[in-house]
């Protein structure tokens, strides 16, 4: 529920950049806690979720949740800090990788349509690409920095194409209720792997500790 409410606020809490029918939404970490909730929220709102995964064995899981397609980030190697804009060769290499990633989105959709919303939480290694592939007038919304906090931004993409970089943290009462309503209506699967009796509480803690 924690990650569900967080995801709901990211996708539905920042007007006018809320998920609308037909909107393309790029979801980083599609098979994780945040991502699995985001895919389902996007689908429930009539959007088209593209999940980014780290292993092929996560593809089926994301597709069953409602993703329109998946991109394996290991198929690309341009991640990390942006090269300096005066480093022509380095920047050209990065741009080639970012464009290839963007094309992978278009290939899934079958049209040249970029994400109106990019659902971010890796941070440092992915922010440059997220901003690049985000559609003109779209939003990159971020709630964490699981790969690091010192992200680099090419400001030209923000001002020339009117893109929004929005921070988001947890949820208020309205957003929590919005998520719980989707859960109660059966539109979202909480993705529980197991349920435990009170007596098995130590076992559940041990399993979480071991990831």
Feature map (PLM): residue ranges:
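Rossmann-fold dehydrogenase core element
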Residues: 136-143, 153-192
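Short, glycine/polar-rich helix-capping loops at beta-to-alpha or helix-loop-helix junctions
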Residues: 53-61, 149-155, 176-177
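Adenosine-nucleotide cofactor-binding segment
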Residues: 43-125
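Helix-to-beta-strand junctions that scaffold the AdoMet/dcAdoMet cofactor pocket
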Residues: 20, 134-135
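C-terminal hydrophobic helical "lid"/dimerization subdomain
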Residues: 128-131, 173-211
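A glycine-rich, Thr/Ser-enriched phosphate-binding loop motif common to dinucleotide/cofactor-binding enzymes
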Residues: 1-15, 27-31, 37, 92-100
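Short helix-loop-beta connector
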Residues: 16-24, 111-113
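Surface-exposed amphipathic alpha-helices with a cationic face
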Residues: 36-44
């Amino acid at each position: 529920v924690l990650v569900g409410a967080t995801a709901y606020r990211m996708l539905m809490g920042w007007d006018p950049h809320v998920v609308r029918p037909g909107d393309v939404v790029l979801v980083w970490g599609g098979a994780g806690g945040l991502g699995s909730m985001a895919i389902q929220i996007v689908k429930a709102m009539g959007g088209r979720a593209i999940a980014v995964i780290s292993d092929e064995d996560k593809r089926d899981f994301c597709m069953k949740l409602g993703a329109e397609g998946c991109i394996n980030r290991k198929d690309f190697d341009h991640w990390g800090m942006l090269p300096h804009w005066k480093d022509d060769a380095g920047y050209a290499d990065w741009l080639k990788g970012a464009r290839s990633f963007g094309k992978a989105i278009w290939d899934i959709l079958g049209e040249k349509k970029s994400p109106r919303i990019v659902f971010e939480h890796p941070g440092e290694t992915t922010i440059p690409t997220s901003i690049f592939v985000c559609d003109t007038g779209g939003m990159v919304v971020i709630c964490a920095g699981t790969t690091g906090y010192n992200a680099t931004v090419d400001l030209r993409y923000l001002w020339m194409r009117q893109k929004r970089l929005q921070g988001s943290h947890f949820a208020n009462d309205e957003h929590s209720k919005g998520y719980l309503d989707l859960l109660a209506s059966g539109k979202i699967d909480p993705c529980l792997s197991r349920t435990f009796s009170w007596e098995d509480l130590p076992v559940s803690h041990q399993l979480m500790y071991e990831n």
